[in-house]
Structures are given as C-alpha cells and as structure tokens.
C-alpha cells in the first residue's frame, strides 16, 4: 500500500516522501524455532546414502547399452544426485557423444542432444532433420509420441541464434503436447504439465528435484535404489539448508534493519531461497551464507533508493558507499547511519571468514556495490526529472540495478579453489554471459512489476522506455520485451558452448541466476509478494521432507 510521510529538515523545510508499505515477513522466526533432523537420525541417513551411492556406481559400471546409460544419467540429474557422480557422468557423456545414433528415434535423439548440450557439447541441431518431411514440416507420425515430443520440447530450449529448427520444434511440440495432455496417463501427464509450465532447462534445480521425485516414484521403469538415494539426499540437504537459514535469520534479527527502515522489504528467507536456487550442494555452504547476507543487504539498498530517500539523501549515501570507511557515516542522513555501519561491518565479517589467500576477493565485491549504488542514484535522478530514457540508454544503467553483477561476484566470494583472482577479473570485465543474464533479470522484473510500480509514481521502467520509443501500448511493450528475454536465453546458451577462462561450475552459477528469475518473477513478483507461490515453494524445499 502506498502512503505519504513527512520529515522535517532543519526547523522549516518539510519533505513529502512516497513510500510503499510491503507485507511483513512470512516466516519470522520459524526456522529458528523449528528444526527437524536429530544428530543420530542424520548419522544413520549418511551411512545409508554411502551404501546407496556405491550401488549406483555399480550401475554405471554394469550398464553398457547407450540408451540405458542416457536414461541413467538423465534420472540422476533430474533427481539432483549428479554432484555425487561427476566422474561417472563425465565418462558416460563421452560414450554418449561417440555413439552411433543412425537408428535412433525421436526420444533417443532428443535425449542425447539435451544431455550433451547441457554439458557444453556443441552438437548440431541437424540431427533433427530426419524427423521432417520434404516440405520442412515435422512428420505427422510423431504426433502421438508423447515421450519423444516431450524430450524434443525440452531439448529445443537449449537452442542458440539462427537454429530455426529448434524454434520450430518448440512451436510444434508445445502444440502437440497441449493437445495430448488430457489423454495421457500418470505420471507422464504430470511431467508434461510441469515442463509445459516451465521447460526443464530453465527450472531451478532444487524445486525441480522436489517436484520430480514424486513423478519418478510413479514410473514403472524406476530404479528403487536411485529413488531411495534421491529421497535421503534431499532430506539430508534440507537439514543442512535448515541450519543455514536458521543462522541467517538470527543474523538478520540481530541486524534489525527492517525495524528501523520500515519501508524496506523483510525477505531474508526469500533471499536464502533465491541463493539455494543458485547452488544447493553441501560444498557451497559457506558461499550460500555469504551470498544470502549480501543479497539481503542489496534488497535494503534497493528499497532505500527506490522507495524512500530523497535525491539529496541518495547522493549522500552514494558518496559514503564510494568512500567505504566508518568515518563517512557522519555524512549519511541520520536514519541511514545504522544501515551504513552495518553494511561495512558485514563485509568486514565476510573478510574475516575467508582464508588469508582469499581475502583479495572482498575489494572486488565492494567495488560492485559501489557501482550498484551509483546506478541506483542515476535511476533516482531519472525519477525526479521525470526522464524516460531510450531502451538502450535505460539498459546501460538498469542491467546494473538488476543486481546480478553484484550477486554474481558475491556468489564467488565464498567458493573454494574454483574461484581465482582471474575469476573476479573476469566478472569485473562484464562478460557477455553476465550481461545477458543481467538484462534477462531486468526485463523479467520490469515486465512483472511495471504496473504496480507506475501506480506508485516509480521512475520509468524498460516497459515505459519501449512504449515511448516505439509508440506502443504497455501490453505490446511487454510482448516485445518478452521476445528479448528469449533472445537473452539464446545468448546464455551460446556462451555455454564456448570455451571460457572460468571453470564450468562458475558458468553454471550464472545460468542458475537466470533460472532463479524464471522461478521468482514468472507471471508475478513473488519476492515482493512472497505470501503467494513463493511461500509454497519455500515450504516445499525447506520444510516438507520425504518419508522413506
């Protein structure tokens, strides 16, 4: 709800502030009070997991048929177990790549294409030409092959620019699957419905695992060893995630910023959910906690510039962040002093958590926050001036205020040896994959949020920029920007097929940032309005465990 408030400046001047009141935290102290897994129970689960992992390794050794190897790899990935079997999957992919596929049907060709593309193999989409007639149309004999169509549908979303056959495949398979949906038996109908809502490649891993395990359980051809391992692994990781979100919630409560800055969104659990979408594996625990804290403070910053501060107050805060020293607090408006000092202290705490040879990472993150604050200030100026920039000019600033340059940098700070000084130099160089991810984030946010924000006298979003530049309605502008979102996905796919100077897991983190946007901002801003779908998803991942 929008409201107005007044603040005295000196003895005379009054400031009329526009501020948006957000709903309070959905979760409060829930994760401090509730913890489900006892130490002895966890110890038994870990022992059983190790036994099951040995059995699955034996499956890799005993499976020689290429199709069965593909199904095994696919199942393990869909169930979130691939981080246990990286060596085995790497060897399996080489076999899959070298296999003779001459006699493969739609299901097999599509599955192979998707698995290999997901892992950076630049496989040609020409493999699908044999499923077209001499007029370039997909063969009518494919129409009833639901499993083949679903695999082609999911494979086609790994397409890059100029791969028109994959664009055609999406249109064809989507139409066919929608028409078949009412005739399909379970669990295939649920699986098709799940991926029609959001394609496999664009889904966040943890939420996919939580929704796919019940589907896999109903499959006739399921492997019960893999199923049990998936459930136990999910529960063990959930226990770890509960510990982390408890720790972060305690930190957030001690910070108490949303008690003094009541105009800011209180969304620390949702921030943690966001980062679990980026990396969920146990080896990233330190990184998750650091990044969740960093993004929570970025959210407060966003609301300060966006919802409450005057232009002069924004300027003073920006200058203080530029200086990044405790003495600069004297220049910050009174109501922001606590925020400023706690921002600096949190980053000092980050530095203290790092090993001596890792401390060089913090200045890179500090610089990204400085760049972010300057961009926030530029948007604040546009708002005061009622300036509507052209789309290209807008994106030069708003791809930064999307926050993903800073979040990407933060997500690398707590990593182990994979993140090097060259990694942080690479982020600072604004690589194409990170630009595409940031623009994707900005456009999805604006498409979803622009109407609500314009109702409260917000500065122009990319939607308004497009409307002004092209003389269109908001509806048409959103449709055109959605086309740009699809183009950004193709940019991301293309960059994943090119050699880079950073390790593949670090590229995957950037992809996962875009997947998080698909989850959180598709159709609705569920971060701001977190008592809707977001609440259900948080519960699915952090509260509801599997019965074994």
UniProtKB/Swiss-Prot annotation:
Reactions listed under catalytic activity: (2E,6E)-farnesyl diphosphate = alpha-humulene + diphosphate
Chain coiled-coil ranges: none
Protein name: Alpha-humulene synthase
GO-annotated biological processes: diterpenoid biosynthetic process
Motif DDXXD motif: chain residues: 302-306
Enzyme Commission designation: 4.2.3.104
Tissue and organ distribution: Mostly expressed in rhizomes.
Function: Catalyzes the formation of alpha-humulene in the first step of zerumbone biosynthesis, a highly promising multi-anticancer agent. Also mediates formation of beta-caryophyllene at a much lower level.
Binding site for Mg(2+) 3: 453
The organism of origin for this protein: Zingiber zerumbet (Shampoo ginger)
Binding site for Mg(2+) 1: 302, 306
Binding, Mg(2+) 2: 302, 306
Induction per the UniProt record: Up-regulated in leaves and rhizomes following treatment with methyl jasmonate (meJA).
Pfam families (UniProt xref): Terpene_synth, Terpene_synth_C
